[in-house]
Amino acid sequence: VDMQTKDCIVGRRSIRKYLDRKITPKQLEEIVSLASYAPSWKNTQVTRYHGVFDEKLKAKIADECVLGFVFNQKIIHRAPALVVVTYKHGISVYEKSGEESTNKGDKWEVFDAGIATQTFSLAAHELGYGTVIMGIFDDKKVAEALELTEDEVVAALVPVGFAEKEPAAPPRKEVSELLTIR
């Protein structure tokens, strides 16, 4: 195992407080260029990233789309950028003919988006940025705010910035609790 990869995985934290320091669209492009290597169903690459830098749009998402969860509202307001991770619906699991390859249905597209979101977060950490993956939001309201097409579904909100501080790692379960060998 490459030591740098191990360090990145172990060192990444959910960052909820950011320095008052901007990040640029170019910096976000670098993160997404790395995240684009995330595996996906038959390499369908269904995940999309919407970088929100516009303060009014970011405020609209924070104030109207996170179901009144004040903690997340504050995080989004304070983050220099917000990435809305989406996926193209109806592509994962399907063959070019339209037939399903498995009985997993549309659950797999969410799995693909999750892998991509984690890859995005690890890439951001490697490049010196902090992220937190948020799941409390009204996906329809976020989609409306971004004027997404019908085939694009919101998977996660990911504030991005420079960490104010690196929090300690929360306790982890023992491997013996996580792994069953048969």
Q: Which residues fall in each region the model found?
A:
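A glycine-rich helix N-cap at a beta->alpha junction
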Residues: N72-A79, E147-A169
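Small-aliphatic-rich amphipathic alpha-helix that forms the alpha element of a beta-alpha
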Residues: A35, V83, H89, E99-A145
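Short, Lys/Arg-enriched N-terminal segments with co-localized hydrophobic residues
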Residues: V1-D2
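A structural motif
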Residues: L28-S36
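C-terminal helix-cap and adjacent tail motif
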Residues: T5-I15, D20, I91, A156-R182
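A short beta-loop-alpha structural element at the N-terminal edge
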Residues: R21-K26
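Glycine/small-residue-rich phosphate/adenosyl-binding loop
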Residues: N43-A113
